[in-house]
Every structure is written in C-alpha cells, then in structure tokens.
C-alpha cells in the first residue's frame, strides 16, 4: 500500500527541491534552445493520470491485454487528430521519441546494408539520418548530402547522388537548417530513382501544423516527428504514412522495436493535437516565424552572421567568428545572463564538436510565453550585448537584470 495523502514534497523532498529550482529557472530564463518549448498545463495534466498504470500492447481494438477499452478511446483520438492536423492517410502515435519513429521507418522498409541518402550532421542534419556514431549509420549504408556554396540545401547534389547510388530511401529534414525545404522536388527525385521518401519534421511540425512551413505529407511516403519542440506537446514521436504502408509501420513499432506503449504520453499527445487544431495555435505558429525573422535580422545588424543568410522557420545558426568567441563560451556566458542557447557546429566548422563556432537559436519557447516582435528584437540586442563583452561580469549582470525584468513581465506558468 501507499499513503494516498502524501505529496511528492513529502515522499521525496530532494526530487521536489530540484523540480522547484527548475521551475524557477524556466520562469527566469529566456529559452532559445530550438528543440525546447513549454507544454500546456492540460498536456502535463494528461501525463500525470492513471493511464501511466495501463499496459496496452497492440493497437486500438487489437490488444494483447484486457481492460483496454478506455485507452483505446484515447489512442484513437490521438490518431484521428494527428491525421486531421497534417492531412495524413494513416498514423502511428506510439513511438517513444523521434529517434524511435525514424528507426521504425528504417525497420519497416530497409535491410541492413541498404543504401540511404540523408543530410550530413555537419551541415544541419540529425544523428539518426546516418551519422556514423548512430545506429542508423552503423546498420545502413548512408550517403550524405549537404548545402551548396550559398548554404542552401543542394538539390542538384541529392539528384546526382540518387542517380549514382540508387538508394532504397531518401531522408529529408534537419535539426539545424533555417530555410524552407522543397519537399515536392525531393519526392520527385526520390520516386524518379526508385526510392521512397521519408521526411523528419521533428523541428518544423508545429509550424507545418500552423501553416507557417511547407507540409511534406502530400509528397512523402513517410513523415516522422517529435511531439514536443514546436508542436508543444509531450516528449514523444509519431509516424505518418501513406495508407499502403500502415501495416508494415505498425508492425515495425510493435512488436518490432517497442513493447507496451506509454498510454499517459499518448493521452498528452491527443491533448496537444487538439490544441494544435485551434485557431490560436495557427496564430502562435505564425508568430514563431515572425519572431525568428526579427531575431535574425537584429543579430545581423549587430555584426553577427546567420548561416544561409536568413531564416524561414523558427531556427537559425549564428556564426560567432566575427565576435571572436566559440559556441562553447557563448553558451556559458549567455547562460550566466539567463539566456539559454546551445553551442552548434556551423557548416565546415574548424572547431571541435564540443567547442564549435556557432550557436543555434529558436523561437518556439519564447513565443509560447508571449514574446512578440518587440521582445524578439530586445532579446537579440541583449544577446549581442553579452557577446560584445563576454568577459565583463558587470555587463553580464546588467543584461541578466534586464532579462529578469522581461521574463517577470511575461511568465510561463504564472511565476
């Protein structure tokens, strides 16, 4: 038995104390890590329900356990809402992460050693798109494509590599690429060369849902995503696919790479998809893109370089070399000023991966807390103020005070 009256703070004061400190950090800091966001109270409430207790191997109506009649309702709501949100023919909401969603597609359509094209990690791709240190790069023969001389996705290179290597699958999508991706063109290249197309929109999903970024679903055979990041849901993954691939994808997820699904997380996914279907979310997605544009333009005015010259999404890579500071140091000093970013390699980066010449910035979280263009411009200027004098403690303290004033005015959960 457990004591129903005991709260978390009473059962485990150490964990409770860390959570309280993290709450303060999230309220006080400007969050600019492009992959982070703030889930709504409703999404978090769904994750803390009794659904965490339920095992439900299988799919709605076809479970290997009894007592699944109510979790069936929840999972079917998540599936139906996801399909409606993106216009998908079929969907699987069980992947526990974006990485597992990608792995599920690979399991479904590839054999070890098959050739795949994916965007180079060094030029904006993701670990699961064939990086040598990742299982994808160890199991399959990934050939990397990248950017052209103008730091735009090199579609001509993709086409040339597809003709030369005849891959089974082409993977599109990125973790650090600011511009629109021409999914229709990539689909044509893939299908003309006998390949399938998988698009990973983990970073762009919220913008796609809100009409602020191109939708790959009409063009791709498979679309994978996380449900957090710009979609503002719980941490997890999804796969959307053409109806003809539904059976093999479902089998690849369960029993292929996962057992019982996390039903409390699937409930939170359903809630997040419902939120994303609202007119307010469309406005949010548009504001994310507007804020990113202002952030990038202001940083350029302050002497920094944006990789690819601009952003057409929520994310941007900032080349710090004009300021003579590394990404590692910039991350640290901006953190002292209560501005949270992550160091990130830029194309052809001369620095080591743990040092880097750049930082990656994103606007989903700042927009969730109510930042608009004026706050985005101010944030960019505060970043530049720190980077202009990164070793001046008085300067960092002055910026931190202004950040604290701004975040107190626009709290996340109410302070």
Curated annotation (Swiss-Prot):
GO CC annotation terms, alphabetical: cytosol
Main location: cytoplasm
Gene3D superfamilies: Aspartate Aminotransferase, domain 1, Type I PLP-dependent aspartate aminotransferase-like (Major domain)
Pathway: One-carbon metabolism; tetrahydrofolate interconversion; Amino-acid biosynthesis; glycine biosynthesis; glycine from L-serine: step 1/1
Domain of life according to the entry: Bacteria
Annotated positions of the N6-(pyridoxal phosphate)lysine modification: 229
Keyword Cytoplasm: yes
Names of the cofactor(s): pyridoxal 5'-phosphate
Site (Plays an important role in substrate specificity): 228
CDD domains (alphabetical): SHMT (cd00378)
EC code: 2.1.2.1
GO-annotated molecular function: glycine hydroxymethyltransferase activity; pyridoxal phosphate binding
Family listed: Belongs to the SHMT family.
Quaternary structure and partners: Homodimer.
NCBIfam families from the UniProt entry: PRK00011.1
Database matches in HAMAP family: SHMT
Name of the featured protein: Serine hydroxymethyltransferase
Organism: Bordetella petrii (strain ATCC BAA-461 / DSM 12804 / CCUG 43448)
């Amino acid at each position: 038995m457990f004591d129903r009256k005991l709260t978390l703070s009473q059962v485990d004061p150490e964990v409770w104390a860390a959570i309280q400190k993290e709450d303060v950090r999230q309220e006080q800091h400007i969050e600019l890590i492009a992959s982070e966001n703030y889930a709504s109270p409703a999404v978090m409430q769904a994750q803390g329900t009794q659904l965490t207790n339920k095992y439900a191997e299988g799919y709605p109506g076809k479970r290997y356990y009894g007592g699944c009649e109510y979790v069936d309702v929840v999972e079917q709501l998540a599936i139906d809402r996801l399909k409606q949100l993106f216009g998908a023919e079929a969907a699987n909401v069980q992947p526990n992460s974006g990485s597992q969603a990608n792995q599920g597609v690979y399991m479904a359509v590839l054999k070890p050693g098959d050739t795949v094209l994916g965007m180079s990690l060094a030029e904006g791709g993701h670990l699961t798109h064939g990086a040598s240190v990742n299982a994808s790069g160890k199991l399959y023969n990934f050939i990397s494509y990248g950017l052209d001389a103008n730091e735009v996705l090199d579609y001509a290179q993709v086409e040339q590599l597809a003709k030369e290597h005849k891959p089974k699958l082409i993977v599109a999508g990125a973790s650090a690429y600011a511009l629109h991706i021409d999914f229709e063109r990539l689909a044509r290249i893939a299908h003309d060369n006998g390949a399938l197309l998988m698009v990973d929109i983990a970073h762009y999903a919220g913008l796609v849902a809100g009409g602020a970024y191109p939708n790959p679903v009409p063009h791709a055979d498979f679309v994978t995503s996380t449900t957090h990041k710009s979609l503002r849901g719980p941490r997890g993954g999804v796969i959307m696919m053409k109806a003809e691939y539904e059976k093999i994808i479902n089998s690849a997820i369960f029993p292929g790479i996962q057992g019982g699904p996390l039903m409390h997380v699937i409930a939170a996914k359903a809630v997040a998809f419902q939120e994303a279907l609202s007119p307010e979310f469309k406005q949010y997605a548009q504001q994310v893109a507007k804020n990113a544009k202002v952030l990038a333009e202001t940083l350029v005015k302050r002497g920094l370089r944006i990789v690819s010259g601009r952003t057409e999404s929520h994310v941007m890579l900032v080349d710090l070399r004009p300021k003579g500071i590394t990404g590692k140091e910039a991350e640290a000093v901006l953190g002292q000023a209560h501005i949270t970013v992550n160091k990130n390699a830029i194309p052809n980066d001369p620095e080591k991966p743990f040092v880097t010449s750049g930082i990656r910035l994103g606007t989903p979280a700042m927009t969730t807390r109510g930042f608009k263009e004026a706050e985005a411009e101010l944030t960019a200027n505060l970043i530049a103020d720190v980077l202009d004098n990164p070793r001046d403690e008085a300067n960092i303290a002055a910026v931190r005070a202004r950040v604290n004033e701004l975040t107190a005015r626009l709290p996340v959960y109410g302070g």
